[in-house]
A protein has these predicted regions:
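Bacterial N-terminal signal peptides that target proteins for export
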Residues: 4-17
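Low-complexity, acidic/polar, glycine-enriched regions of mature
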Residues: 29-226
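N-terminal signal peptide c-region/cleavage motif recognized by signal peptidases
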Residues: 24-26
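Hydrophobic alpha-helical transmembrane segments of integral membrane proteins
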Residues: 20-21
Length: 226
């Protein structure tokens, strides 16, 4: 009798634990359908830093694309779904946040060398990299080119990104009530020597590929009383 009770208790505990673990999965499975772009609220959107990444790739000796990232960056987006071409985006990047996963940390701090070296990002003298859009051109139902000014190392040059609208919610799942969410992917290529960053060219490539994955969320939408 005692053994049967113990087995029942163990099974009950396992079932209860499984139910708890399944709850987030069930909630995700019941996420609402994405909204049409025209249904999303107009206004200012801020970057969801938990769900955003900024990586870049550069050729190393023509053998591989060396990949690194910035972990400290921010962006804001102004959007009017009825006039997507009027969208504007601004971004700031902290060059001190560059990460390369350099494997020999005991040998040298390569991330710090890239961030602060006068021949690299020289963050002590130029602590911020900025991007400000100047034009958005639609290229498809969910795609556009975003042209803007990239300022780095005290030099400002135009850059064009190819952006894809991944989708949006008028009520972003797991967000506070009234918060909309949208997502974009974007890629672009710059010639680093245009900003005076020409160290080791051409052994280390001049062309740098930029890859952005971003989610933005709106401020809570205030519901007007009937």
């Amino acid at each position: 009798m005692k053994e049967s009770i113990m087995k029942f208790t163990a099974i009950h505990r396992l079932s209860f634990t499984a139910a708890l673990l399944a709850m987030p999965l069930a909630a995700m499975a019941q996420a609402p359908a994405m909204a049409k772009p025209s249904e999303l609220p107009a206004g200012a959107y801020t970057l969801d830093k938990t769900h955003a990444s900024l990586t870049w790739k550069v050729s190393h000796l023509g053998l591989a694309n060396y990949t690194a990232r910035f972990t400290d960056f921010d962006a804001k987006l102004t959007l009017d779904p009825k006039n997507p071409a009027a969208a504007r985006v601004e971004a700031t990047i902290n060059p001190l946040s560059v990460e390369t996963d350099y494997p020999n940390a005991a040998e040298k701090d390569f991330d710090k060398e890239l961030a602060t070296g006068a021949q690299w990002f020289n963050a002590t003298k130029f602590p911020t990299i900025t991007f400000k859009s100047t034009k958005v051109e639609l290229t498809g139902a969910n795609t556009a080119t975003i042209t803007g000014n990239l300022t780095m190392l005290g030099v400002t040059k135009p850059v064009t990104l190819a952006a894809t609208f991944n989708g949006g919610y008028t009520q972003k799942p797991f967000a506070p009530e009234g918060v909309a969410g949208i997502g974009f992917s974007a890629t672009g290529t710059i010639k680093r020597s245009d900003w005076g960053l020409a160290t080791y060219v051409p052994a280390v490539g001049d062309s740098v590929q930029i890859i952005l994955e971003t989610e933005f969320h709106s401020a809570p939408q205030v519901k007007m009383p009937n």
